[in-house]
């Protein structure tokens, strides 16, 4: 049975970039990785309603952490006069014991962000809205926003069924095996009375223009040995015979 590879990891280093930018020695790698997880978990858990799509972490020095939060509602993170963003920074300083700088960037088009679409569908399911209606509405909004293809899948005890199953809807193209395809992927969970329902969203936005590549210089053609005939092995001496009359 075929399985779907993660669209982000499949294109990592080709059309997608890393979410964490830092380098560490082997002895420090695990602690910094756990620190990244703790930072993302704190922000996502305490500000879930802010519509956070992506959290980028960069370490330019040993005691400095730069965090960029991509959100659909920057006002909820910044607060009145920047009070909320300062509160986030202070809590992260206590969590990491390092200097923390927080930057907030607004997501211009939330309908084309797969993570935000998945979280929106999960929230509607938790509010007892029919999952089919939530999925179809999300697909229509994404297509109107300019998406070339959308696929949404819900898995779990849908509508409280005794047996878990998966249902999905798709509109347009989703070329999962094309490395130059700009496919955004998001995953969210809806916690209901009957259990957890997983929501996956794929959004195809078009092809990414190929990166600039230097023209490959053509190698000189390989010399092909010429076939030597037997007649060429021995040169024939030309002899002139003078015949006296």
Swiss-Prot record:
CDD domains associated with the record: KH-II_30S_S3
Gene3D superfamilies: 3.30.300.20, Ribosomal protein S3, C-terminal domain
GO molecular function: mRNA binding; rRNA binding; structural constituent of ribosome
Keyword Ubl conjugation assigned: no
Superkingdom: Bacteria
GO CC terms in record: cytosolic small ribosomal subunit
Biological process per Gene Ontology, one example term: translation
Pfam families from the UniProt entry: KH_2 (PF07650), Ribosomal_S3_C (PF00189)
HAMAP family assigned to the protein according to its UniProt record, in alphabetical order: Ribosomal_uS3_B
Summary of subunit composition and partner proteins: Part of the 30S ribosomal subunit. Forms a tight complex with proteins S10 and S14.
Name of protein: Small ribosomal subunit protein uS3
């Amino acid at each position: 049975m075929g399985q779907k590879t993660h669209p982000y990891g499949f294109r990592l280093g080709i059309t997608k970039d890393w979410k964490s930018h830092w380098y560490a020695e082997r002895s420090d790698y695990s602690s910094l990785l756990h620190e990244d997880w703790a930072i993302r978990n704190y922000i996502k858990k305490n500000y879930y309603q802010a519509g956070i799509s992506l959290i980028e972490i960069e370490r330019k020095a040993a005691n400095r952490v730069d965090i960029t939060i991509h959100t659909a509602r920057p006002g909820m993170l910044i607060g009145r006069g920047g009070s909320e963003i300062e509160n986030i920074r202070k809590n992260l300083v206590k969590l990491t014991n390092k200097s923390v700088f927080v930057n907030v960037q607004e997501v211009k088009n939330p309908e084309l962000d797969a993570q935000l679409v998945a979280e929106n569908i999960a929230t509607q399911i938790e509010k007892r809205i029919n999952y089919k209606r939530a999925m179809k509405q999300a697909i229509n909004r994404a297509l109107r926003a300019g998406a070339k293809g959308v696929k949404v899948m819900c898995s779990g005890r849908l509508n409280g069924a005794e047996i878990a199953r998966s249902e999905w809807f798709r509109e347009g193209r989703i070329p999962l095996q094309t490395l130059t395809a700009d496919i955004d992927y998001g995953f969210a969970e809806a916690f209901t009375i009957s259990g957890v329902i997983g929501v996956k969203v794929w959004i195809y936005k078009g092809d990414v223009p190929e990166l600039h590549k230097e023209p490959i210089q053509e190698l000189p053609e390989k010399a092909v040995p010429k076939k030597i005939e037997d007649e060429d092995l021995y040169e024939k001496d030309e002899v002139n015979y003078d015949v006296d009359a």
